Amino acid sequence: VVQKFQEVIGLSVVMGGISFVVSMIIAVPLGILAATKQYSRADYVITAVALVGISLPSFFFATLLKLLFSVKLAWFDLYGLVGRDYAQLSSWGQFCDRANHLVLPIVTLVIVSDYIRTARAKGLSEHVVIYKHAFRNTLIPLVTIIGGSLPGLFSGALITETLFSIPGIGYISYQSMVAGDIPFTMFYLSFMAVLTLVSNLLTDIMYAVVDPRVRIS
């Protein structure tokens, strides 16, 4: 069970890490823009996009992306981690082939990511106040979202990995459940439970770091 887990966890962590970084790069600047342009057209557009992103399920976006970029435009393969000629490619070619197959799954994770919710941050209109004071006050909900998403970062995206046949921990766990592999299923669920407890602990610690008012004296 442990060996099987070690073989697939790395890919899920890479996908989750990339989607985390991309989501933060997108969400935080958009949140600041919405705060500095409160009730403007930009604010309403950002709010609408954020609401759509968190309201529609991941399989809906995954299906749309596959239909557009795989079926219509033929830019990416429909599923899998490598192409048919993977073995004949150079080391750099194999890297690019894997990266190409991870584009759509990662885009799906970014679109439905909880971090996009931070784009709805509100604040005062003055830029200096926003960047130096108000932004610090938005760190509490930001820490909550990041901490709550830690299990998903390391446990894989079961639906996304299954739809794109990416052999990460989520996909392998789903296959194990379908096949009745009880030992691996129990290991995966226990792993998720431990991650949830650790994420809650880290979230509480970070609360005290970003906001001294919640510290226990």
Briefly describe each language-model feature range:
Residues 9-42, 58, 85-217:
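Alpha-helical transmembrane segments of integral membrane proteins
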Residues 48-80, 101, 108:
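Membrane-water interface segments at the C-terminal ends of transmembrane alpha-helices
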Residues 45:
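Conserved active-site segment immediately N-terminal to the catalytic lysine
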Residues 1-3:
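Short membrane-interfacial helix/loop motifs at transmembrane-helix boundaries
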